[in-house]
């Protein structure tokens, strides 16, 4: 999540799934478990494939599950990480999270952002998915087929609208009649 690294995504897939295809099957099974109804993965990188597809709703379900996972959330919120030197690398390496909404020197920085990912391919245009939390309310924004350079601003607008116009309500047992069948 810190740096775009499709080679690492493939290595992780092989390690966890036994093969890339095995991991992709795990991805598709998990998507179904999460309630996704129009998502088919064909690779762990997210790179275009004519048989791979999803919807904004399904991406929101996947993002919610990811952000609810404390380990994932800790990684997604990390802005940089230093990999110590090894006998192969010869020196330490710094990985920087390139998600603009987490970078406080970027115009797209959003203080309530929990993490996310943005990308671009010719097939899908600009895309972004992120989670944010403010005053105990958690929201997810998904932008698909966006115009280049606008997805973070669009996500901020959506999140601000949600935070400004919706609130959590607690309904007690006596606040409404319950019909039993």
Please place each PLM-identified region on the residue numbering.
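Domain-terminus/edge residues, biased toward the C-terminal soluble/receptor-binding domains
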Residues: 36-37, 51-53, 57-58, 63-181
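Active-site-adjacent loops and short helices of periplasmic peptidoglycan-processing enzymes
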Residues: 1-57, 61-70, 134
């Amino acid at each position: 999540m810190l740096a775009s690294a499709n080679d690492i995504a493939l290595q992780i897939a092989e390690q966890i799934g036994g093969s890339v295809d095995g991991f992709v099957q795990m991805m598709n099974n998990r998507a179904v478990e999460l309630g996704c109804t129009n998502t088919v993965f064909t690779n762990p990188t997210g790179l275009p494939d004519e048989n791979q597809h999803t919807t904004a709703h399904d991406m929101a379900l996947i993002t919610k599950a990811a952000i609810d996972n404390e380990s994932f959330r800790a990684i997604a919120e990390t802005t940089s990480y230093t990999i110590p030197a090894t006998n192969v690398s010869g020196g330490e390496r710094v990985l920087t999270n390139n998600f603009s909404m987490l970078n406080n020197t970027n115009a797209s920085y959003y203080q309530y952002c929990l993490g996310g990912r943005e990308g671009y391919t010719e097939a899908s245009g600009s895309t972004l998915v992120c989670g944010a939390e403010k005053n105990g309310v958690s929201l997810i924004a998904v932008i698909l087929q966006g115009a280049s350079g606008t997805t973070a601003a669009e996500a901020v607008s959506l999140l601000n609208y949600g935070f400004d116009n919706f609130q959590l309500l607690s309904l007690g047992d006596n606040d409404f009649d319950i019909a039993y069948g």
